[in-house]
């Protein structure tokens, strides 16, 4: 029992100091999030198994799945029949995509029983 308490207190202290050292880690971009897969801290709370890491010092940031890694480097210029995307790099380039109009589409049909 004593070893479990010591391991739990060590995990709490290490997560506290890790939180202090990486306080502004999520500011730099969407790829830097609080739940970093390279540095995962596992803490088991025997009093409450339903809450993931019930330590108030460790934040759990939400993240959108389709967020871009460098959102300031991509700029969409026009969205009409052609979509021009301007990619801000060291070498400037633009990519143009043409949307296909549906002039000769067939009629919709219903499935019969």
UniProtKB/Swiss-Prot annotation:
One CC-aspect GO term: cytoplasm
Compartments in which it is found: Cytoplasm; Nucleus
Predominant subcellular localization, coarse grouping: cytoplasm
Source domain of life: Eukaryota
Entry keywords, A to Z: Cytoplasm, Nucleus
Name the UniProt record assigns to this protein: Uncharacterized protein YGR219W
